[in-house]
Amino acid sequence: MSRIRFYFDHSLAGYFLRRAREKWFTRPPQRVNHHGVTLQVDCLPQEMQGILLAGRYECAEVALIPGFITAEDKVLEIGGAIGFLGLYCRKIAGVKEFVSVEPNPKTIAYLRSNYELNGIKPVLIEAALAAADGPVQLQISNLFWTDSLVSKADQSTGQPITVAGLSFASLVERAGLQFNTLIIDIEGGEKYIAFSDLPEAVTKMLIEIHPEIIGMEAYKVLETLIRSGFSVQGHSWNTWSLQREKAFRPRGQG
């Protein structure tokens, strides 16, 4: 009997049976510990589950945050997603004041659930960063990290929803926090930020740029930041950490 089982397991039929079992009967864990943060995964689409279970989610940011963002920093995060970076900063980096901005109602539900799992209450602004205040169309899909205000070449799997839009100045006012650090990942929406008008108190930035969505405008964002006194501290893929001296003023001013 064992010999028959051996030959069956190593046959083509045995291979397809194993694949069927893996697909239909093997359930992913309900939760995963990702770099010290507990995240709910069984509610997410299969592709997103796979990325989290493989430990590949937000790898660039995790590589750049240690030693860059500290417990003394006050952080405004634009693009809160499912709450991982906020929780990582709170739990691992020790940040005490952290405000997240996220427009997608479904993703907000994931964020709130993950914060609850980790015993932390989120401070959340439910809106999208936009060029001006008012309702905006957000393109969403099952993969929350593709949500964007910017039209893309391939929107075949997405759908538009109407969400509240706030200008950067309005977000700053709504946050009610004298933050010194910005975390930005908004799928091309970085082009809507007037980086040359950043509050002087902002001395640190962790930003993912998206040239695949907004083309050369993404690199103009970096150029504007450097002209505003920021210098590159590190980068991983399209994510950059930048820092400047406090109360920087461009040449010819002040």
List each model region and its residues.
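Hydrophobic packing residues within well-ordered alpha-helices of enzyme cores
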Residues: 89, 111, 138, 193-194
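Glycine-rich adenosyl-binding loop in Rossmann-like folds that engage adenosine-containing cofactors
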Residues: 29, 35-62, 125, 130-170, ...
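S-adenosyl-L-methionine
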Residues: 1-104, 109-113, 211, 218-219, ...
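Active-site segment flanking the S-adenosylmethionine/decSAM binding pocket
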Residues: 74-82, 160-217
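Short, hinge-like loop/turn segments at secondary-structure boundaries
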Residues: 116-118, 139-145, 200-202, 223-225, ...
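A short acidic, amphipathic alpha-helical/loop segment
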Residues: 64, 88, 192-201, 220-224
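Short, conserved SAM-binding/catalytic segment
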Residues: 111-122
